[in-house]
């Protein structure tokens, strides 16, 4: 059997077959053929360049060639060492099978060196290239290139072996510029272009520059909307074959990449690589603008847009613009209502796979991300990152309009919407509008009465996972959030933040109607309903309406008689946990709320607020019937009953109401004590 020739490793396509391939598949074929030729040259099988290779290098269609044109001539001279002998893209299984099958037919033991050369390094023409590569390799890897009579190196660098290299995690090729390592030389070559900014491929539509033609092709598919690869399971289409492969694992549940540190498995190798940085703490991507570091390059790229404020991806439906194509794709689902990711545990559907992943943790209770400072654990790495800023005091996001600083960019975005008044999310049931889609989702549960989050301890259900988390602390007694000022502890971080404002006196939310200021935006929203008289929450049992859903929930317990909160000290039961908390202070004698004006102390903040009105003489609650004003809304409510009972107008005058000895009759006369 003679030595291997290019004909043995060439794959032919007819014109019809070639036209059936898409651009990505044609590029893949081109890369495979060029690699086969480079490998033959590398082995010292000196061939004149076949017309097929010339054609492929000029990016012409190979199917237009005749069969005899593909046959290589007898050996003439040895070609130079091809440094980038590995292709830039992964070879598809179909091409792998054909190529490796052809290698097997001839046998790699028959891949002979050119006569007169005992080793690959003997060839003078590519000795320099070989020596350059040899310096990059370990001693073991270097020996792989030295063979006596037959060349085994060809098989050593086959696709099968390259696949093994990926799974063993070996990364012999290191970038001298930043120290990053790669398992393939071609990956290192591509990576180097990032440093030299060799962005030769430019998008004519948006002006974006890329250092790979494949990256430009991928980019074009984003705005063209070209999606060739469709999932047979759910019908979803993708613009890359690799993305489809990764997507299929959602259905199969396959997770072939496992972390040796904690045992967690992943469906993608890249996700495993990123995950490993949680354990190592590595953050190789640094922002030149603000100095912030990132463990993932994609997160770093997204972060950069914060500084540029570039938003190239626009929604055709509503005109809203985004800085990520993925965010636009997710946003479109608001208009279509599509929720392709479904939880098998409870049937809940989501429009993002990442949201489904986060949701699943509710059922498992898994909290793999632990704070080294205080030991608190979280189910999301992003929440751990946010939590750490409590210890460091870092607040990198500042809104110049109000001067407020935030630990998260998302919180800054939310705050901006408060000032602009933007509310793009509309409830179809009642017409109410919201600033955030998540708030609309929660609001809808009022109409559907859906409560997917259930307490295993007492069976109580909630419409928010955060409410369930807070509720569980009633059973455990856990209060992880402590005030450094007075030592008071809270079950929720939001309660601690609200409490801190008591000490600082900060009240950023002001009512335009009466000028009253509040610590929380939610309190301002509730307060506004006093002026509008809006009471959207109605009791089906008795028809009574309320301006807060929480008050309706409390009211319903009057009908059911439910009192789930019991005092261990005296066995007294309450309908609300807040009432139990207030009651406990009777036993302890605790009165943490003190009046700065007169020094009087109270066991409830609401009572201190009411008391302060004695000093300020503030009476915000006014009777529309007779203009009488009150310090409390409850007093106004009681007063209104006088008008409803048909009492004459002068009964509103305190002088006509007299002392305590009489009672008011329906006619307005007072019964005198006998």
From Swiss-Prot:
List of residues that carry Phosphoserine: 605
UniProt GO BP: regulation of transcription by RNA polymerase II
Cellular component, GO annotation: nucleus
Keyword annotations: DNA-binding, Metal-binding, Nucleus, Phosphoprotein, Repeat, Transcription, Transcription regulation, Zinc, Zinc-finger
Primary localization class, coarse: nucleus
Role played: May be involved in transcriptional regulation.
Protein name: Zinc finger protein 429
Gene it is expressed from: ZNF429
